[in-house]
Amino acid sequence: MKNHATRNPPRLGRSALAALLCLLCLAAPALAADFPLAVTDAKGRQVSVPRRPQRLVVLSGNAADALRILRATDLATGVTERIRENPVYWGSLAALPSVGKWNSPNLEAIAALRPDLVIGYGANPGPELEERLAPLGIPVLRLDLHRLHSLEAEMADLGRILGREAEASAYLEWHRAALARIRDLVGRAGTRPRAYVEGYSDFRVAGPGSGIDEMVRAAGCLNLAETMAIPFAEVTPEWVVAAAPQIVIKAVSGQRSYECADPGLLPRVRERILARPGWSLTPAARDGRVLVIASDLCPGTGAAAGVAHLAAFAHPEVAGRIDPGAVQREYLTRFLGLADQGCYVFAGARP
């Protein structure tokens, strides 16, 4: 007689099948997690994250925005004073315990919170952050999250670390599509207006290596400082006049722009620039082509909105096909969960 057992294996009962499915579901997170996880930080170093973080200390505003994008603010246990001082923008994050300044935090306060990961900028604080926290078993991950060339990789890495890959992918898909459309439109314009790009300090020009330089280039402009060897350099008024910029872009340090704490700030900055001695000789000043942009919007995770504003300003011929307000609105409402408001850009109309 033939043995039919191999053709008709015993079936699992409903209760046994349910139990098996439950075990598989419980095992799935363990199978998906690939820890320790090695990622490249903002300094190009390999950093090992030993396990999926459940308690984060956030020293960077850009990283705090990234947590909102990834729907992971519940993991934060400590923030800097700069975040605590602006509850209108930061919401519940501003109510978390303080660990001091973003560039010189209180390391004892960090240790007391028992974080399993600290996220800070690439350059600041200094190496003492790792030196003091490493003996306590607290890893430090340095992510700038404000440079176009590395923003996508850093967001993807943070999404993997926190188990928020889907949220990271949704943001990156939007970010890439927005920038691709802008680059296509300004590429068709066929012109690259000469731009004098000034950092937060007067006559401190932003060159290669600065976040704003990358954004200006993405907006289809020729940065007059693109041949300089350092990200920021001091220049003279004579240098600017001789360079004959067609447009001027001035970055202003974050001043609680979301709540528009000082509506007159950006107009005042622009007025002072136009009144500089000798600047009336430049094409930019003669034509009133001066734009002031707040760092609250860019550079950072909202870079696509900042590039949209810069491109529409620099290329009037295609401005009607670029809607900076729409890009900004989607960033604020869809990804940060905020209302569509703020004073971020001023180029001669209402902020």
Language-model-detected regions and their locations in the chain:
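N-terminal secretory signal peptides that target proteins for export/translocation
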Residues: 1-11
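A ligand-binding cleft/hinge motif common to bilobed small-molecule-binding domains
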Residues: 124-135, 252-273
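Short helix-initiation/N-cap motifs at beta->coil->alpha
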Residues: 42-44, 97-108, 228-237
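Bacterial N-terminal signal peptides
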Residues: 16-27
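A short, structured surface patch at a secondary-structure boundary
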Residues: 55-113, 117-122
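Extracytoplasmic substrate-binding proteins
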Residues: 32, 36-39, 46, 117, ...
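Alpha-helical, coiled-coil/dimerization segments enriched in small aliphatic residues
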Residues: 85, 210-232
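Proline-aspartate-enriched helix->loop->beta-strand connector
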Residues: 106-123, 138, 236-253
